[in-house]
């Protein structure tokens, strides 16, 4: 049985844009249904950025703690991060996000050596203009966040090609809801799987 890790943020966790609860069906759950021959571990946390974040469950430090201290036998690690890098408090440029994702790949290769899993790096969906009207997220994201979200795929795909890893652009399959401009509704999770 193939083992897959999905490592991401609130769109991997399944943040419901309507009421902030967890959606019962996420792209990870749908992937598990579509790939019963795979054992899929879903590790999504709200607010997770590539390098830093609030709390112990965020950034690359969390990845190291969970997947380097005790080695796992994953065949594939899929990482979808970058949306929280666009927060006003961080404002990473797309190129910095791509470099941070490169760090995940490099460090995993050092730790796992010849048992390094394959990587699938997923550029997240675009943040849309509705985020600027949302009562909560308008305080966290800016017009620059919306624009930079559209540039993530180019920077991340270039890095993925340089590192010879798989790449997918989630924005080709799904979009953020018009409710909050950041998170997917169930139908978009189903489309992105």
For the regions a protein language model found, what residue spans apply to each?
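Substrate-gating cap/lid alpha-helix
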Residues: 128-169
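Residue-level recognition of beta-strand->loop/alpha-helix junctions
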Residues: 42-44, 123, 169-171
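Histidine-centered active-site loop/cap adjacent to the catalytic His
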Residues: 31-35, 166, 177-193
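Conserved beta-strand segments of alpha/beta enzyme cores
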Residues: 39-41, 118, 164-166
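A short helix->loop->beta-strand "cap" motif at the edges of active sites that frequently abuts
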Residues: 109-118
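Conserved SGNH/GDSL esterase-like catalytic core that processes O-acyl groups on lipids
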Residues: 2-5, 11-103, 113, 147-151, ...
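Short acidic/His/Gly/Ser-rich catalytic and metal-binding motifs that mark active-site loops
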Residues: 86-88, 128-133, 175-177
